[in-house]
């Protein structure tokens, strides 16, 4: 049972809150702690403490304004924008008037988009056959493709044989945020109503249980949960069909999975966290069009992951680099951020960065479950597209092309059903089952099926290297046609071992030239939130972080978060520690919601426009 917020009069605590971005965490060494003090209230969000029982909300006008549309799309990423563009293309071609509204939680289109990104352009060219004439930002065709295995000191080159997923011939290195921004312009030119800075916070339902639309979040709420004088209720958007294109681990999709039991016939999703930086490097080290991928060091063979280093041709010697770490890792002492910083010091990586300048940083979770983890995609009144259900081709390290194609197929399926209905009617919750059928008959389904066994093959005794052997034998020869389907090992949060069973990892200190601390890194993400609002990182039980996560796992949230949101600080009275949530640091990666071993953290949307401000990430 939660208790009232303890009085926090400590001067150090006030200093912490005076900073906009906080330090990563206070080191707890290998000791697990428990607290003798009363558990302070951490969570004040109305999703945990309903406002109808709070006297401070008595007399507040809770009426919401409602708008009607034919289609509402949640999320302006590659999938959502592809659906929006294709719907309006079809409407123009068939001389139909369809109202399409798209809401995006970022302040600008593309500001929350982060990917490698090496783009397979097939679906993009299908959507925009005249992309060159329209000036789409595909500036860097791949000219060189390399793959290697890293040991601590050496790089072992591995040939990329024709037909293997890693082959990038014909692809483009892109800054996906810029591409998404360009797609947003095309959508608006076609008549799509695009609303950046509006965060979809709630799914609305008809009396019959079908999806009615969404509501954006309320704004003007104090940190303690009380209404401000500037309080405004969110907006309701009703539609015949609502498309959920939130990206990986969307918070509304989580609700829909439970409401409609969409995961009844699939395996749990498994995830990775991708950390990325942009650097301007010395021109003599610049190889425009080069794509370089590695596996191995600094991760052990039982920790799935790999790195990328892409040389962009953007008018300056720019490289995009990053590390992906599978979130099914077992050691609670592992820090994906610090593994990334350590990786940059490898003898095959460091020379590229020496003399350069880091200009951007960010992180985002990504789906790795593949074919086995795809849920049911349609339900009365709505459907899922893109990285929300998870169409990433993991060995190919690409999901943008499949996300775009899913958006195109969704739009075509919806248009067919909309135009067979009376567009002037307020049809209740159209169930567009044709979309799932069309997807299963497309190249997306065939592609994901062919690589379905590669990611789970890494769970054997040989780990990642066993997966490489499996890929070389079965994928290269049989092209994924083996008569069996391997399974994943369960949910990622279940894989974490107790701290007593693991060895703490000693990471080298950052040198400030190649590797950096978390504080300076988060600053480069541009992340910003209104400070005086309830933390959007909500806890179902405020006592669990200390009494379970810290006690058993030595507080893994302070290490798996790539933005320093979670830290354990000394209590003001008594012995031990308490969890402090620095919500303004959050880059919306969703890792905490995925990896928390107690599944106590629930990520909800903050006020619209908050979060990272990525520029072409």
Swiss-Prot record:
Residues 577-606 form the 4Fe-4S ferredoxin-type domain. Changing residue 452 to K: In GA2C; uncertain significance. Changing residue 377 to P: In GA2C; uncertain significance. The modification N6-acetyllysine is found at residues 96, 132, 223, 357. Gene3D superfamilies: 3.30.70.20, 3.30.9.90, FAD/NAD(P)-binding domain. FAD binds at residues 71-85. A ubiquinone binds at residues 305-306. Changing residue 222 to P: In GA2C; uncertain significance. Pfam families: ETFQO_UQ-bd (PF21162), Fer4_ETF_QO (PF05187), Thi4 (PF01946). GO terms for molecular function: 4 iron, 4 sulfur cluster binding; electron transfer activity; electron-transferring-flavoprotein dehydrogenase activity; flavin adenine dinucleotide binding; metal ion binding; oxidoreductase activity; quinone binding; ubiquinone binding. The modification Phosphoserine is found at residue 551. It catalyses: a ubiquinone + reduced [electron-transfer flavoprotein] = a ubiquinol + oxidized [electron-transfer flavoprotein] + H(+). Its EC number is 1.5.5.1. Binds 1 [4Fe-4S] cluster. It is found in: Mitochondrion inner membrane. Changing residue 49 to C: In GA2C; uncertain significance. Coiled coil: none annotated. One of its GO terms (biological process) is electron transport chain. It is linked to Glutaric aciduria 2C: An autosomal recessively inherited disorder of fatty acid, amino acid, and choline metabolism. It is characterized by multiple acyl-CoA dehydrogenase deficiencies resulting in large excretion not only of glutaric acid, but also of lactic, ethylmalonic, butyric, isobutyric, 2-methyl-butyric, and isovaleric acids. Accepts electrons from ETF and reduces ubiquinone. PANTHER family: ELECTRON TRANSFER FLAVOPROTEIN-UBIQUINONE OXIDOREDUCTASE, ELECTRON TRANSFER FLAVOPROTEIN-UBIQUINONE OXIDOREDUCTASE, MITOCHONDRIAL. This is Electron transfer flavoprotein-ubiquinone oxidoreductase, mitochondrial. It comes from Homo sapiens (Human). The gene is ETFDH.
